[in-house]
């Protein structure tokens, strides 16, 4: 039986992963589930999937979960704290680790799984945005296997030659006959909104994505299109791509999840209904194919595909991320940290929608040139960028 650890089990990706498992009973054994503090969801899922371990980052939540599991006669062992995340991610009995903790908090346990040589199902894009070169070097050094979960990167992965699939991050795209990666995005809920109205966007409007069901933070990131910018940075590291080998294309229907253009003029694309269960099922079973529970694509109901060039006045965060990628690792780390803080402030109605870009840009300009020669340096830079962003948010509040 293939043992699976799900980091971030109560989140959108974690719940979609459990959906795929339900469609494939007996194929995977859940070794561990983790969450921050969602006791109710973890209790339900622990009783259904009977993991050996359950980790709650919050100690009070861990105590509550342990007490409730005990009343149900569950044998699941409850652990607490960030160190426990790393412990289960690197557990000797774990075969695959779904890295689905949102944000910088997911870096340490994901890196622990990498250093233990696990098969990493990477849904935490911040791990690469924050620590790209260090992360990929650890993958190579420890013989870990990396499979992308983001729908776009999973689509690109599926469109690449098998030889490149076996060595992502260290491949030669041009040598394999590839001229360009085409990274698609819906453009979010405001692609047709008058630019002058964007300053008045509310959190409720920003999280109402037209195509995908996602968590609040990633929904706001989609609305600003920094999500696509972070994916641009992620693609740079995942596929060893130069900035000029990646092009962002707005595709409102969210049916073509990304494409790869070859030198002979061919373009390979991966299509499907916009449901994260598809890339999750692909990565879980790779190189096999299993049921995902997603309805087959009905081309007649889709009707047509359209493509739009990004407007950087509408999406300044996208342009910031592309510039950060060209500038280097410190810039992408600072941008990611600032964005997490800015989005949290926007969701708390402390700053406006367009203030997110202002906080991001000012933080990146201040700290993007910082020297960072180690992972510890990047973690320190992440903290400094958050402090800088906090100060900017206070000024805007």
Curated annotation (Swiss-Prot):
Family of the protein in this entry: Belongs to the DXR family.
Enzyme Commission code(s) on record: 1.1.1.267
InterPro entries linked to this entry: DXP_reductoisomerase, DXP_reductoisomerase_C, DXP_reductoisomerase_N, DXPR_C, DXPR_C_sf, NAD(P)-bd_dom_sf
Source taxonomy: Bacteria, Pseudomonadati, Pseudomonadota, Gammaproteobacteria, Aeromonadales
Catalytic activity: 2-C-methyl-D-erythritol 4-phosphate + NADP(+) = 1-deoxy-D-xylulose 5-phosphate + NADPH + H(+)
Keyword Nucleotide-binding: no
Coiled-coil stretches noted in the UniProt entry, renumbered to this chain: none
Function: Catalyzes the NADPH-dependent rearrangement and reduction of 1-deoxy-D-xylulose-5-phosphate (DXP) to 2-C-methyl-D-erythritol 4-phosphate (MEP).
Residues annotated to bind Mn(2+): 150, 152, 231
Origin superkingdom: Bacteria
Binding site for NADPH: 10-13, 36-37, 124, 126, 215
UniProt entry tagged with the keyword Oxidoreductase: yes
Recorded name of the encoding gene: dxr
One GO BP: isopentenyl diphosphate biosynthetic process, methylerythritol 4-phosphate pathway involved in terpenoid biosynthetic process
UniProt-recorded name of the protein: 1-deoxy-D-xylulose 5-phosphate reductoisomerase
């Amino acid at each position: 039986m293939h043992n699976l650890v799900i980091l971030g089990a109560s989140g959108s990706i974690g719940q979609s992963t459990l959906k795929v498992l339900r469609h494939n009973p007996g194929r995977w054994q859940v070794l561990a589930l983790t969450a921050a503090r969602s006791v109710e969801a973890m209790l339900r899922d622990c009783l259904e999937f009977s993991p050996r371990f359950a980790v709650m980052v919050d100690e009070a939540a861990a105590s509550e979960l342990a007490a409730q599991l005990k009343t149900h006669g569950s044998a699941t062992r409850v652990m607490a704290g960030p160190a426990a995340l790393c412990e289960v991610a690197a557990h000797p009995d774990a075969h695959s680790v779904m890295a689905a903790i949102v944000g910088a908090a997911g870096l340490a346990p994901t890196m622990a799984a990498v250093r233990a040589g696990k098969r990493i199902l990477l849904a935490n894009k911040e791990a690469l945005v924050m620590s790209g070169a260090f992360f990929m070097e650890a993958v190579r050094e420890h013989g870990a296997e990396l499979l992308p979960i983001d729908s776009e990167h999973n689509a690109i992965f599926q469109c690449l030659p098998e030889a490149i699939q076996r060595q992502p991050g260290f491949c030669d795209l041009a040598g394999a006959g590839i001229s360009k990666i085409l990274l698609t995005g819906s453009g979010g809920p405001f692609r047709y909104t008058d630019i002058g109205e964007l300053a008045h966007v509310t959190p409720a409007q920003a999280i109402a994505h037209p195509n995908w069901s996602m968590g609040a933070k990633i929904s706001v990131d989609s609305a600003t299109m920094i999500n696509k910018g972070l994916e641009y940075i992620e693609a740079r590291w995942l596929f060893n791509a130069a900035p000029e080998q990646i092009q962002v294309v707005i595709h409102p229907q969210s049916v073509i999840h990304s494409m790869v253009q070859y030198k002979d003029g061919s373009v390979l694309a991966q299509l499907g209904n916009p449901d994260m269960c598809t890339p999750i099922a692909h990565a879980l079973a790779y190189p096999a194919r299993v049921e995902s529970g997603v309805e087959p694509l009905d081309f007649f109901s889709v009707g047509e595909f359209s493509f739009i060039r990004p407007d950087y006045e509408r999406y300044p965060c996208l342009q910031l991320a592309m510039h950060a990628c060209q500038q280097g690792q410190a810039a992408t780390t600072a941008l990611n940290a600032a964005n997490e803080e800015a989005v949290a402030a926007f969701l708390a109605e402390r700053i406006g929608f367009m203030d997110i870009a202002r906080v991001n840009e000012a933080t990146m300009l201040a700290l993007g040139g910082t020297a960072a020669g180690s992972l510890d340096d990047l973690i320190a830079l992440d903290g400094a960028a958050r402090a800088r962003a906090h100060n900017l948010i206070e000024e805007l509040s």
